[in-house]
């Protein structure tokens, strides 16, 4: 899968339960459109969406499950329960929050990575700082993504792509670095790859019409 996405675009097709496009059928259609537009892989949330997207596109999938727990701020594939659920799908890679925050039930992130590898799948580390990226490489993750920059209280807070973190990671770790988070234009995508990103994930700017519409209406205010 890593060979397939190198230098190419990954599109995130997600619509949570409170969003207007929340539907596995709709996400499948969205993924088909992304494939027709040249996406090399899809990042998808939830078992039903993953299964539908795999069936209709046959593209490689980065699978996640977003689930909230009372005893932790981590919600992207937080525990072994979510890993086990994802391993029952045909997703080639599983992404999980690899920040330094405490996991639900005090679970150990290394156990999750080992379980993913034991089933022959790849593991992506969603991180928010350089230090977390370095630790992710030590833990055995196959790639690291800037997904959570700005979403932890101790990381850089910004409304734009964290190109600084991307550059630091590219210079520091040996595993592939994926740029993800707030990429809104083709130019930003190209800049990420020019700075050394192995690949990049674009989500809302392509697959969330309410977000796209708001960018247009905001300029009228």
From Swiss-Prot:
Pathway(s) this gene product operates in, as recorded in its UniProt entry: Amino-sugar metabolism; N-acetylneuraminate degradation; D-fructose 6-phosphate from N-acetylneuraminate: step 3/5
Catalytic activity: an N-acyl-D-glucosamine 6-phosphate = an N-acyl-D-mannosamine 6-phosphate
EC assignment: 5.1.3.9
BP terms from Gene Ontology: carbohydrate metabolic process; N-acetylmannosamine catabolic process; N-acetylneuraminate catabolic process
One GO cellular component term noted in the UniProt record for this chain: cytosol
A GO molecular function held by the record: N-acylglucosamine-6-phosphate 2-epimerase activity
Cystines in this chain: none
InterPro entries: Aldolase_TIM, NanE, RibuloseP-bd_barrel
Alphabetized SUPFAM superfamilies for the sequence: Ribulose-phoshate binding barrel
Keywords, in A-Z order: Carbohydrate metabolism, Isomerase
Tagged with keyword Transmembrane: no
Protein family membership: Belongs to the NanE family.
Known role: Converts N-acetylmannosamine-6-phosphate (ManNAc-6-P) to N-acetylglucosamine-6-phosphate (GlcNAc-6-P).
Name assigned to this protein: Putative N-acetylmannosamine-6-phosphate 2-epimerase
UniProt organism field: Clostridium perfringens (strain SM101 / Type A)
